[in-house]
């Protein structure tokens, strides 16, 4: 259902990137944030094919909650591609804007003892086990390793998300600094599942000049990764958010189903495929599939704000 001709797709994307960056945008090359994940690795590889290794800048932008694997694998990608790369520790900037403090304040409204040595992450209930409500909870781990999960108030949840969103926005500011000084374009890394479902930060990782893989389902990104020779450890690494201090999968935090099932359901919904056929391929019952479809529609409604352009008091006709 999601199989593609990887060679033809790579050739098409590379050709499009050249036309967009060199022609439409009149930039000399591209900046890519390297997270050590599958999406940024594929985008960096595509950009290197399009512009050559001397016209691609890879950025590593860790902070104190980042996994060490992200930097290690990101460096491996840059080394294999032979591209210029820079380490930008955004931790001091995250600290300076008060992101850690604001997150801590919100957490302490539900876990008063939370402090040094503790770790946390946000989690949602798997959609197939839920009653239809996407309720986010906070999981914490104390210095002795004891784990507990508590329900958040709406205000605490929103403040935690708002505070952590600083990280993505500071990374994007850093990307644009280097893009401006080099006269480069910023390449975004969202795939179709993430972009459709709103799994990005407005004016953060959802912002870019070009988005080479935004039309591809996550499953298809993995197909390109294999064709392009992306490092096997990266291809085998489970998708993570790398946002909170506790290790966290994307399905724990947002999608509530493994990406390959979300892809199948989203593809089926987008292409009007009969629900019984989609359910059979995904290994779901019809009621389970309808739960997934309901979740997809709910996230699409929530993502409308993230995709929206600024609203003008008077429409301007000029482009």
UniProtKB/Swiss-Prot annotation:
ATP binds at residues 33-40, 189, 218, 240. It is an enzyme of class 6 (ligase). GO terms for biological process: NAD biosynthetic process. Pathway: Cofactor biosynthesis; NAD(+) biosynthesis; NAD(+) from deamido-NAD(+) (ammonia route): step 1/1. The keyword Nucleotide-binding applies. Keywords: ATP-binding, Ligase, Magnesium, Metal-binding, NAD, Nucleotide-binding. It catalyses: deamido-NAD(+) + NH4(+) + ATP = AMP + diphosphate + NAD(+) + H(+). Signal peptide: none annotated. InterPro entries: NAD/GMP_synthase, NAD_synthase, NH(3)-dep_NAD(+)_synth, Rossmann-like_a/b/a_fold. GO terms for cellular component: cytoplasm. It comes from the Bacteria. Mg(2+) binds at residues 39, 194. The keyword Acyltransferase does not apply. GO terms for molecular function: ATP binding; glutaminase activity; metal ion binding; NAD+ synthase (glutamine-hydrolyzing) activity; NAD+ synthase activity. It holds the Pfam family NAD_synthase. Deamido-NAD(+) binds at residues 169, 202, 209. Its EC number is 6.3.1.5. Catalyzes the ATP-dependent amidation of deamido-NAD to form NAD. Uses ammonia as a nitrogen source. Belongs to the NAD synthetase family. Homodimer. This is NH(3)-dependent NAD(+) synthetase. The gene is nadE.
């Amino acid at each position: 259902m999601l199989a593609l001709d990887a060679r033809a797709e790579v050739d098409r994307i590379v050709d499009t990137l050249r036309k967009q960056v060199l022609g439409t945008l009149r930039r000399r090359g591209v900046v890519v944030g390297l997270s050590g994940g599958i999406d940024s690795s594929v985008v960096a590889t595509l950009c290197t094919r399009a512009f050559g290794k001397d016209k691609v800048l890879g950025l590593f932008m860790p902070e104190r909650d980042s996994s060490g694997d992200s930097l290690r694998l990101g460096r491996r990608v840059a080394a294999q591609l032979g591209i210029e790369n820079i380490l930008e520790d955004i931790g001091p900037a995250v600290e300076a804007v008060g992101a850690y403090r604001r997150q801590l304040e919100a957490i302490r409204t539900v876990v008063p003892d939370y402090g040094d040595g503790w770790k946390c992450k946000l989690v949602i209930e798997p959609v197939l086990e839920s009653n239809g409500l996407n309720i986010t909870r906070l999981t914490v781990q104390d210095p002795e390793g004891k784990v507990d999960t508590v329900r958040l108030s709406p205000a605490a949840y929103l403040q935690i998300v708002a505070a952590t969103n600083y990280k993505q926005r500071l990374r994007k500011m850093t990307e644009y600094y280097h893009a401006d000084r080099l006269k480069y374009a910023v390449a975004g890394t969202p795939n179709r599942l993430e972009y459709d479902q709103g799994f990005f930060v407005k004016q953060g990782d959802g912002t870019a000049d070009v988005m080479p893989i935004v039309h591809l389902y996550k499953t298809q990104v993995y197909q390109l990764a294999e064709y392009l020779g992306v490092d096997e450890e990266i291809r085998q690494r489970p998708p993570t958010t790398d946002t909170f201090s506790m290790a966290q999968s994307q399905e724990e935090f947002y999608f509530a189903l493994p990406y390959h099932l979300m892809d199948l359901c989203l593809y089926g919904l987008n292409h009007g495929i009969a629900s019984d056929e989609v359910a059979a391929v995904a290994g779901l019952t019809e009621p389970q599939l309808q739960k997934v479809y309901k979740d997809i529609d709910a996230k699409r409604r929530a993502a409308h704000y993230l995709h929206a352009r600024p609203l003008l008091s008077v429409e301007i006709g000029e482009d």
